[in-house]
Amino acid sequence: MRGPGVKKTAFSVLVALWMASATNAAWAQSNTLAYAEPTIEVDDQLRQKLLDNIRAADSFQDRFDAEAWLMLMSGRLERYVRDPDRRLRLLRKIHSAARQTDLQPELVLAVIEVESHFNHYAVSPVGAQGIMQVMPFWKNEIGRPEDNLIDLDTNLRYGCTILKHYLERSEGRLAEALARYNGSYGSYRYAAKVMDAWERWR
């Protein structure tokens, strides 16, 4: 996950084991390299951010702008989510989770496209779960083992919080932050994929 500057704050993260469908299997195969030997770091600051943000309520900052954004992004998301009502609900949640952590919603969309192709049941070969492919160990790290990472809202909160944390830690160096998020620090293949996708969403 690499790219230009992105601001501060933090929010959700992690992945737990769940339904592995044929679609998940095909997707997982293509992402095996990205998830090989993940090296995701845990620290007290990130734990606290997750705890602070996991309970936050979702809301748009500007209703008119949000609705205009939803309509624009809906057309772009159609290739992944056919049903228009489901598409708008999903976009609303993504926009809200991104804004709560002061992330650009289009960047979060790019991460999701690369991570799961918008399949919130996706499970990677190493167990990363949900739409933002969060690792299940994060639940224990913040003392919330009961959290369901397949739940869309929960997964977005975890994922956005983690991504924001790594952006702050890397002082806005998006490529580095994305590599840390993906557990592939030192390799920029994953970051390049996300940044290419980001260009399409912006």
Regions found by a protein language model. Name each.
Residues 51-202:
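Catalytic glycan-binding domains that act on GlcNAc-containing polysaccharides
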Residues 1-75, 80-85, 202:
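N-terminal secretory targeting signals
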